[in-house]
Amino acid sequence: MCIRDRLGSYRFQTFGEYSAVLSTFNIEARQIRGEFKGEPYTGIIYSATDDSGKVVSPPFKSSRFGKRFGNERLEKRMLSHTRDFKDGKWAPTIHAQVVYAMRHARSREELTGLLKKASIDAVFRENEQGRIYGVTFIDHNRREVFNGSRMGKEFSANIYNELFKWWDGIPATERSAHTGTELWQHHSHKAEPGSALEQAARIFSMETNPVDYGEEALARRMKKRRKAKRKSRGV
């Protein structure tokens, strides 16, 4: 389990995003909390997994790989990445590729396959009932990691939860007889106003009318910074 080589220079802002990128290399990272000499501490342990995410090795303490992979150094790294993100030094650039995959796929498997062709991994987190409550995208070309909600509400977990259920509800014979785009043309009008499926259908206009999500996100962050400065000056 060569974690030093795998992590490289990926940028992420939360431990969840960090563990998501490692999971694509069959590595599980878990935080452990406890108390030592009356003081609380947080540590990280790493394990190897198989392709289904099942742990197949004993856990290894972060100290085995060096301080860089311990909780203290990781917290500093995430803080630095978050600061740079807020300053507009990096931002998601994969919106168009994700939208293309959503529009042209006919199943969850096809969606992840199309993303992989663009060197993008999607990690979905599900509860015991199978409901998706989180999604993280890993852009391996730029080595950047984003929770779906950070890319925009159109890429949040709820969208994919409803999208996958919608795909599964279409008869297999119909799915195999049509492209993903044709399925949307045949069925998207049935989506209830304000539903997650309607939101998904709206973003498909990106293919003909691209939206610069990175520019929009930067504008929102700069607006927040200006408001914060005015508050600090008592304006």
Residue ranges of each PLM-predicted region?
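Extended intrinsically disordered terminal tails
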Residues: I3-V235
